[in-house]
Amino acid sequence: MPQVALTFDDGPDPRWTPAILAALRAAGATATFFVLGECVRRHPGLVGEAIADGHAVEVHADHHTSHADMTRADAAADLDRVLDVLDGLGVRPARWRTPWGIEADWTRGIAAEHGLEVVGWTADTKDWRGDPAADMLAAVLPDLRDGAIVLAHDGLGPGALRDGCEETVALVAPLVAAARDRGLEPGALR
């Protein structure tokens, strides 16, 4: 069946990740969570909860810093830290989404050294702006097709213009329904 990947960045967050997980559970859908090591260290149980629900857990960063603002050595050390914390939980990521999707000349080389695929997105909810769920859905509908990767957030990363993820939680059910109406199965990255 054709698929659309649902992805969430910047967690786990003790308030918003459980709400996103509950919304996905209610909709009967899975997703991929690109996590921050600094958040995983504070809330490791949320990673286990996501995995228990059938979601994928992948790498975002240890600290949310753009590769444009880092040296290769700093980015490699940041990646090593988040991989170490995930390894301690028994999680072996296969994918890496860099903060803001920004890559440096050396990003893919570091990824290859760790056996990671660098993954971006094709449909951006821009939920960091705090728009209503209906507006976010309207924005991603034109890009909802087989193989699409939808970007949303279960945490409040740097640059967020909102103070919560209520609208992202509210987006899950209509987004899943819209995908299914188009003959797409929403789920984790394959």
Regions found by a protein language model. Name each.
Residues 8-10, 35-38, 59-61, 97-100, ...:
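A cross-domain feature marking catalytic cores of carbohydrate-active enzymes
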Residues 65-70, 158-162:
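A short acidic, helix-capping loop that chelates divalent metal ions and anchors anionic groups
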Residues 1-66, 74, 78-85, 91, ...:
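Active-site beta->alpha N-cap acidic-glycine motif
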Residues 92, 102, 107-143, 184-190:
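His/Asp/Glu-enriched short active-site or ligand-binding loop at hydrolase and phosphoryl-transfer sites
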Residues 74-79, 132-138, 165-170:
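Charged helix-capping and loop-helix junction motifs
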Residues 26-27, 41, 162-190:
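C-terminal domain-boundary segment and adjacent tail
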